[in-house]
Amino acid sequence: MGSTSDKIAGKTNEVAGKVKKNVGEATGNNELRAKGAAQETKGKVQTSVGKAKDAVKGAVDRM
């Protein structure tokens, strides 16, 4: 995946995970809350990977 794709997928997973987590908390559904928290974390990692790719590309471009 390219850096932009990673960042978009990451943000999508973050938002979807946050929604699931909040719905799970509101309804007392611990399984949904946990799945949402995991998806949110996955999204944060994907976003970080995209940012890291941008940083590496920027460093290489400056050489």
Curated annotation (Swiss-Prot):
Return the InterPro entries for the record: CsbD, YjbJ_sf
Q: Which SUPFAM superfamilies match?
A: Hypothetical protein YjbJ
- Ranges of Basic and acidic residues composition bias in the record: 51-63
**Which cysteines in this chain are paired by disulphide bridges?**
none
Q: Which domain of life is it from?
A: Bacteria
**What is the similarity comment for this entry?**
Belongs to the UPF0337 (CsbD) family.
Q: Which named protein is this?
A: UPF0337 protein Atu0782
